Amino acid sequence: MELKNLIREIPNFPKSGIIFRDITTLLSNTDGLHYTIDILTEKCLEFKPDYVVGIESRGFIFGMPLAYQLNVGFIPVRKPGKLPAEVYSVSYDLEYGQDSLEVHQDAMPAGSRVLVIDDLLATGGTAGATTQLIEKAKCNLVGFAFVIELKELGGREKLPKVPIISLIEY
């Protein structure tokens, strides 16, 4: 199945000159969604993670079923103020400003093997910040999985030297 055919391209969104890669058309396609989760599972089995960490919010969409298929726990990485217990927090730079991500301090025991998933790898900022959260938790990053990778933005080069899976490349 050619997953790229299930991604809708919206020109000039969210601003002029940008082509937005819309995954909602993939999500609404039953066969495409099943195939996406199945191929992610197949490719991520070798990582042998203890946990799948999904980045808010679209990382949750793919992370939960992947964790289920891998028979491991799921850990949400959230925007600030969304988690009720003690958190590790990391700030990171955006094109115009800063943002932060958080994870519960007791979400995963030190030494756990962690796989990070998100829908899209662009500049690597969000995935890089998630890496810092995993380091604060004293866990071991075993790999990244992305549905889409925007190669021209060079995000892969900014991430730790662990395996990186992307199903669709632009």
Curated annotation (Swiss-Prot):
The keyword Transferase applies. Its main location: cytoplasm. GO terms for biological process: adenine salvage; AMP salvage; purine ribonucleoside salvage. It comes from the Bacteria. GO terms for cellular component: cytoplasm. Pathway: Purine metabolism; AMP biosynthesis via salvage pathway; AMP from adenine: step 1/1. It is found in: Cytoplasm. It catalyses: AMP + diphosphate = 5-phospho-alpha-D-ribose 1-diphosphate + adenine. It is an enzyme of class 2 (transferase). Homodimer. Catalyzes a salvage reaction resulting in the formation of AMP, that is energically less costly than de novo synthesis. Belongs to the purine/pyrimidine phosphoribosyltransferase family. This is Adenine phosphoribosyltransferase. It comes from Trichodesmium erythraeum (strain IMS101).
